[in-house]
Each structure stands twice: as C-alpha cells, then as structure tokens.
Amino acid sequence: MTIEKVNKDFNQIIEQNGFINTGAKTPTGCEVYCREWNRKVQVAWYGESTDTLEIKIWISYGIPMVWVICNGRIEDRIRDYSSPKRAMNAIKEIVRCAGLEM
C-alpha cells in the first residue's frame, strides 16, 4: 500500500467517524485528529462523576498512530497499526470495551 493511498483512506475514515483536526502537530509535522466521549457515572461515596475517553490519531510516514487517554491519564504507549481500517476497528473496540458508543 502506497503512502498516498494510506493518506486517502485515512482522511476518509477520519471524516466518517467524527474525528476533528485539533490544529496540533506532532514533532514530525503530522496533523493530529481527536475525538472525545463522555458519560456520567455513579461513584461510591462520591456521587456523580464524568467518565472521559479521548482518542488522538495521526498518520506518520504511512503508519496510523493512536493515543488513548482515559480520564486524563495517558495510556502507557502509543499504538501503531498496519492500515487506517485496522486502526479504526481497534478504536471501535476500545470505545465499546469502555462502555461507550461510536
């Protein structure tokens, strides 16, 4: 798969799934796209709280990179995938396992 095809597929998938351009760039100059999910949860002895899942995605030299941030805590590593479609399938699964919907 060529870098041009990967970029084209990436842009289509990003548009279809509601990610927005944050205006930020990685140190290598790649544009970062982001989407955030929120839900209200009941916490024992605390009451109602907001549960947040934020996913940032960008493409670096033809490789989709995904960064997961849950309740303000950054996951231990940046995930990389072999294609934009695989990255989006993984994001959908992460969102589903978090109890949220795309």
Regions found by a protein language model. Name each.
Residues 2, 52, 99-101:
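Acidic/proline-rich low-complexity IDRs
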Residues 7, 14, 33, 42-44, ...:
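N-terminal non-cleavable signal-anchor helices
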Residues 2, 12, 54-58, 68:
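Generic short N-terminal amphipathic or hydrophobic helices
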